[in-house]
C-alpha cells in the first residue's frame, strides 16, 4: 500500500517544536491530514496549537510498512513521531 507523508512542525505550549509526520492514504485530502494532526495534538496535551497547511506540508508518497498500513486501515492515519513528541 502506498501512503502520503505530511511533514509537520508545530510549536508546543512551552515554545519548543514538535516534529512528526501525518501519514495517510494518497487520496486523503490535505485538510483531512491536518484534522488527523490536530487530533494527535489534542491526545498529546497540545490542543489549540496552530496547525495549518503551513505547519503540515505534503512531503512525498512511499510504500507503507505493515504497522503503518494497519493503522491507516483502522484509524485513517498513522503518526510517525520524530522530535519533541511525547
PLM feature spans:
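Generic structural hydrophobic/aromatic packing signal, biased to beta-strands
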Residues: 6-8, 22, 37, 79
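Short, flexible N-terminal segments of the mature chain
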Residues: 18-43
Amino acid at each position: 500500500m502506498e501512503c502520503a507523508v505530511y511533514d509537520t512542525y508545530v510549536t508546543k505550549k512551552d515554545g519548543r517544536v514538535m516534529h512528526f509526520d501525518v501519514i495517510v492514504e494518497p487520496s486523503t485530502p490535505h485538510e483531512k491530514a491536518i484534522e488527523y494532526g490536530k487530533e494527535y495534538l489534542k491526545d498529546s496535551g497540545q490542543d489549540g496549537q496552530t496547525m495549518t497547511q503551513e505547519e503540515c506540508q505534503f512531503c512525498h508518497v512511499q510504500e507503507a510498512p505493515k504497522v503503518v498500513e494497519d493503522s491507516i486501515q483502522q484509524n485513517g492515519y498513522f503518526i510517525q513521531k520524530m522530535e519533541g513528541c511525547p
